[in-house]
Each structure stands twice: as structure tokens, then as C-alpha cells.
Amino acid sequence: MQYPEPISKLIDSFMKLPGIGPKTAVRLAFFVLGMKEDTVLDFAKALVNAKRNLTYCSICGHITDQDPCYICEDTRRDKSVICVVQDPKDVIAMEKMKEYNGQYHVLHGAISPMDGIGPEDIKIPELLKRLQDDQVTEVILATNPNIEGEATAMYISRLLKPSGIKLSRIAHGLPVGGDLEYADEVTLSKALEGRREL
């Protein structure tokens, strides 16, 4: 169906979001058109504000509105332990359980040869640079329990094995093929408790 250009552009914009197909994009576009103008403007301002004012922490790679982020700045956190995760959403999921008190390192992806993503395309070099600090004694690999996450964890473990740093992998209380961001706090807590040394 032919829509007026402003609606077509709105539909196209929604389709750029993950998991949004043509039908959902049309529904969202018409929902937005039915909203009050001030609500739409607030929504648009929130999008622009988030894009302009958020950045990635120069230390750990977590999303933040200050650099370094609040986690890296917190002097009460254990700087001898780094938990390696794939995405900023995984940091948020780990923080929800309120049991982990170390630092994080966000890779911003996972090794995936099928998608053309190699070790140099994610933040592994930055991790290695951070580990040159003698203060770090343990690395917890909390990549997703899927093929890409496992490949990434194995690659990092092979790199770090000679360093003498204690390596562990979160336990598989998480469903294989799942993502950390969708796990509940109890499942994450059990997975962290049951991590194993590599």
C-alpha cells in the first residue's frame, strides 16, 4: 500500500530497529500518529538526548553519561576481578542481582566467523591492555552460552592461560543459546556461584 511520505519514512525508521518487521512498523507508526503531540515530542527528545549524551566508558566499555562510568569510579568495588561480558545490557543484568562487586569489561560483540567478526573486531585488545595492571588476579568469562559466546570465551582463555591470572567461566545455569539480558536474577546468581576455572 502507498502511504504518504512522512508515514513511509516513519515506518522505514521503525523497521531499522531489531525485531521490527513491516507489519509491526506500520502498527507502531500509526500508534505514534495517534499519540498527543507533546508525548511524541517528549519521546523524540528522549531519543535525541540519549544518542547525544551517552557514550562508552573509556575503561570498561559500559554505556554511560560520564567517563569513566560509575562502576569504574566506585572505589568500593574489587579491582582485582574483571567480569568479561558481550554487551552493556549484560552489565545491567549482572548488576541487578547485587552480588558481584568487581569490575567489568564489555567486548561489544562476540567472535563469529560466519558474520565476519574476528577477535580484532571486538574489545579483546583493550582487555589485554587492562590486564597488564598487576592488580587484576581473576577474570570471569560471562559471555553468552551460545556458539559465538563459547568461541569468544575459549579464545580469551587460550590468550590468558599463560599469564597466571585465574580464569573462570560462569556456570551454565543459563539456557544454552540464550542471552544474559533475559535471565532472571536467581539464574544469574546461580550461574555466577557455579562458575568454573578454565
Curated annotation (Swiss-Prot):
The keyword Zinc-finger applies. The keyword Protein biosynthesis does not apply. Gene3D superfamilies: 3.30.60.80, 3.40.1360.10, 6.10.250.240, RecR Domain 1. One of its GO terms (molecular function) is zinc ion binding. It comes from the Bacteria. A zinc finger (C4-type) spans 57-72. Keywords: DNA damage, DNA recombination, DNA repair, Metal-binding, Zinc, Zinc-finger. Residues 80-175 form the Toprim domain. GO terms for biological process: DNA recombination; DNA repair. Belongs to the RecR family. NCBIfam families: recR. HAMAP family: RecR. PANTHER family: RECOMBINATION PROTEIN RECR. May play a role in DNA repair. It seems to be involved in an RecBC-independent recombinational process of DNA repair. It may act with RecF and RecO. This is Recombination protein RecR. The lineage of its organism: Bacteria, Bacillati, Bacillota, Bacilli, Bacillales. The gene is recR.
